[in-house]
């Protein structure tokens, strides 16, 4: 892995949008930037205002610091160089930090187009074959052919990128992300996130009616308790349905809640059916407010009337008439006084 630093061009024209610098080992060096391609390592050729970029506009000074590089920027232009939108005094060196924004050229007034040469500075570690070319610094005053960008020779068998064309801006951003550089670029529109996926479909919850048993299925032997809801009297109520549908019934509960309207006569319904109509034990006849099987039925007048069935004789009783609670009926078997007397004898 090579300790390098990079200049990523943001916006501007086409081509030359990513420059990677690797100074020679063990010695410092200087890179020049300007419109004189014969004197500079990075040629800045403006398309709009040629006079805004000097022949040698600025210099990058790289000095070894441990296993990394200390990079400073020095301005030599007549139009100015900005670091993080602050103009650098001419001839003054400023040490750069990872993520600094460099602008070569004057800062235009509000409402005008920005400079063509707007770069982001970053320090990275790359493999030699990851980039097609790395800048080799020129000697001061040297204008020989071969300086500037030179191709890096990859390892044996490794593919080499062509030098005829440069990567477009989106591809340059992808390269930066692939080597773990500058997370500040990730929210930008040019950043591509391969881990993105389409919207995941959420599971559709089952309707509450599917959680309990259906009214058509006969209840099992051990489910003998129920709660029967009697609604307020309504004169315009229609005929009651054959099978009152349960609102909610959990698989192991002995009590359930049934909704049943009143009959046209205005009287309350009797106790609920234990089995469907086809079963041999039919519910008591509706009408007359039939009491439960308790010797002394108190005829509860509440809106919700709780019924409990004897586990011995299958006879229905009002919970209030037998003196037990709904919770006790759920948790334990219930036997009427007659069945309890038979067991004792």
Swiss-Prot record:
Residues 31-88 form the FHA domain. Zn(2+) 1 binds at residues 296, 298, 318, 321. A zinc finger (PHD-type) spans 293-342. Zn(2+) 2 binds at residues 310, 313, 336, 339. GO terms for biological process: regulation of gene expression. CDD domains: FHA_TCF19, PHD_TCF19. Pfam families: FHA (PF00498), PHD (PF00628). The modification Phosphoserine is found at residue 78. InterPro entries: FHA_dom (IPR000253), SMAD_FHA_dom_sf (IPR008984), TCF19 (IPR042803), TCF19_PHD (IPR039095), Zinc_finger_PHD-type_CS (IPR019786), Znf_FYVE_PHD (IPR011011), Znf_PHD (IPR001965), Znf_PHD-finger (IPR019787). Potential transcription factor that may play a role in the regulation of genes involved in cell cycle G1/S transition. May bind to regulatory elements of genes, including the promoter of the transcription factor FOXO1. This is Transcription factor 19. It comes from Homo sapiens. The lineage of its organism: Eukaryota, Metazoa, Chordata, Craniata, Vertebrata. The gene is TCF19.
């Amino acid at each position: 892995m090579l300790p390098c630093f990079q200049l990523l061009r943001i916006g501007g024209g086409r081509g030359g949008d990513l420059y990677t610098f690797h100074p020679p080992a063990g010695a410092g060096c200087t890179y020049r930037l300007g419109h004189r391609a014969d004197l500079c390592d990075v040629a800045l050729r403006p398309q709009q205002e040629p006079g805004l970029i000097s022949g040698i506009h600025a210099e990058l000074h790289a000095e070894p610091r441990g296993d990394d590089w200390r990079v400073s920027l020095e301005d030599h232009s007549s139009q100015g160089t900005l670091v993080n939108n602050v103009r650098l005094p001419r001839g003054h060196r400023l040490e750069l930090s990872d993520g600094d924004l460099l602008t070569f050229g004057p800062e235009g007034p509000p409402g005008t187009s920005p400079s063509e040469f707007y770069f982001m500075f970053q320090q990275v570690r790359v493999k030699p074959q990851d980039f097609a070319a790395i800048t080799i610094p020129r000697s001061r005053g040297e204008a020989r052919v071969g300086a500037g960008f030179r191709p890096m020779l990859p390892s044996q068998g490794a593919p080499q990128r062509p030098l005829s064309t440069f990567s477009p801006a989106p591809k340059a951003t992808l390269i930066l992300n692939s080597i773990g550089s500058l997370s500040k670029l990730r929210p930008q529109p040019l950043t591509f996130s391969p881990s993105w996926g389409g919207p995941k479909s959420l599971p559709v919850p089952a309707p509450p009616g599917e959680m309990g048993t259906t009214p058509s299925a006969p209840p099992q032997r051990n489910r003998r308790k129920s709660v029967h809801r009697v609604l307020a009297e309504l004169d315009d109520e229609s005929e009651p349905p054959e099978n009152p549908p349960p609102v909610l019934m959990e698989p192991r509960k002995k009590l359930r809640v049934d909704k049943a309207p009143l009959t046209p006569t205005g009287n309350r319904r009797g106790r609920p059916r234990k089995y469907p109509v086809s079963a041999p034990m039919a519910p008591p006849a509706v009408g007359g407010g039939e009491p439960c099987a308790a010797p002394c039925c108190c005829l509860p007048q509440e809106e919700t009337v709780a019924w409990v069935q004897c586990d011995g004789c299958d006879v229905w009783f009002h919970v209030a008439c037998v003196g037990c609670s709904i919770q006790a009926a759920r948790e334990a078997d219930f036997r009427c006084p007659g069945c309890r007397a038979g067991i004792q004898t």
